[in-house]
Amino acid sequence: LKIARGINGTADQMIYMVADPDAKTRPVIDFQGLCTGMTIGGDYWYFKGFDVTGSADGQKGLQVSGNHNTLDQIETYHNGNTGLQISRLNVTDTYAEWPSYNLILNCTSYGNADKGYEDADGFAAKLTVGDGNVFDGCIAHHNADDGWDLFAKSATGPIGVITIRNCVSFGNGTLSNGVHYANGDMNGFKLGGSGVGTPHVVLNCLSFNNGATGFT
């Protein structure tokens, strides 16, 4: 499921993909382990109130690659890699084209695991992320790798400043069935890597019962 680059709203007229507020159950986009998940390449979209699950092994559940998008009350779980990740759309994209100014609001990501139990985070904004991205009021728990992963490396250079506020990360490195896996990094909030520094902002966040470090 891909929203291609160029299918855009505007600041004054966003495009909405929103669940029926009167529905008795939440809509579920289930890829049943067969394919890649959902990719957002457009700008100025507003998503609210649905679940994304079942991406194939090694495939992210939901990838945000556009700009100025809002994801509100989205749940990503039991995907074959990271539940929700902000990263570039194409390998040829330059920093100016990396996803910027996206708001991830009141979202939850849990139970995401690749077969090697070493790469699937709850949330990630890593490697190829632009400026002004924000996570607010989100929860990551019981993912195989980290709760949040903001990894950067020298080959692609520093990423933009990420703001994480009012968020909770717990139980990562142990899946919800209680089985502990030691292959992943298992941090609550991983805020960099490879000696490539970015002054990310973390405000009013809580991390507990993760397999490794709460904040690193």
Tell what function each PLM region has.
Residues 2, 31-40, 55-64, 80-86, ...:
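Short glycine/acidic-rich loop motifs that flank beta-strands on beta-rich extracellular proteins
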Residues 4, 18-20, 41, 48, ...:
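Feature marks extracellular polysaccharide-active and adherence modules
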Residues 5-7, 42, 66, 90, ...:
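Small-residue (G/S/T/A) turn/hinge positions that recur once per unit in extracellular repeat modules
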Residues 5-60, 113:
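Right-handed parallel beta-helix/beta-spiral solenoid domain characteristic of secreted/periplasmic
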Residues 8-11, 21, 97, 156-157, ...:
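Extracellular/periplasmic catalytic domains that process cell-envelope and extracellular macromolecules
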Residues 73, 166, 180, 193-216:
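Extracellular beta-rich repeat passengers
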Residues 90-98, 177-180:
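Intrinsically disordered, low-complexity Ser/Thr- and acidic-rich flexible linkers and loops
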